[in-house]
Amino acid sequence: MRAFAAVALLLAACTQPQVANVTVTAMRASPPVAHGRVAEVTFHSRALDVDKRYFVYLPAGYGTLPRRFPVVYLLHGLGGDERDWIDQGHLPEAADRIGLAAMVVMPDGDESFYVNSVTPADYANCVKLARHDFAGRRETAASFCVRHADYETYVARDLVDDVDARFRTVATRQARGIAGLSMGGFGALMLAMRHLDRFSAAASHSGLDALLYAGPHPYRKGHVQLATDVSRWGAEVEPIGALVRRIFGPDVASFRAHDPAALATTLSDGQLAIYLDCGTEDNFGLEDEAAYLHDVLASR
């Protein structure tokens, strides 16, 4: 599956450690690396009712070959923005290094968890405060504040439609994958599982893969506890918990409707290609959620 191969290769390349101060003696010259380029786009999202910016990596052959290209959507984590994968993930260099023959779209997800929030946006107050708990240092009110907090619709509909209209894409689900880090890993799985007409592959790197997973820590198969009361969800990691509760609301059904581990039980065999990983030094128990989701998928 083209989209899955692109997602897995790209995520591995962007998240592998950078090696410095290493001397290598070349035995023979390596072929030159073909370089892609990064384009910056601003468009109006109907779902958010504001203008949003995204970056798109165009592979080396985009300017010379008449063909169309598959697309990977790459989502940033909490506190990040649309430049994170370029500045910190070194996306262009990683994509060039593996010869990625796909476009990579990096949108601005603010602190939304890529969900249509149950709490309405307060645009006027957001602009007035001009300060946001998790917004990156580059964020201004103009780039952060929205009139409607419908981020799921913004990514799955507005963004995908704009990219397909603006660039030479293969505009089918089979040629679209979505991946992300942390909040973005959750967003990638959730969006792909809830919009199977849009995406055929999803990848989560240290993501919130099971919103309602309540233990044990470490994970033990067959002993899983799932939360039934979300009134204090994430209380041990405030203010992140308060943000998530504001987005999903007080109803456990809202959490369950967006929980990748719950959504995974509805998938048919071969319906969605999925890649999961998590760092060994994670401090939020996310590796337990990844292990649980893996077993949910394996047991279907």
PLM feature segments, named:
Residues 11-13:
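C-terminal motif of bacterial Sec signal peptides marking the signal peptidase cleavage site
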Residues 7-8, 101:
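Short, surface-exposed beta-edge/turn micro-motifs
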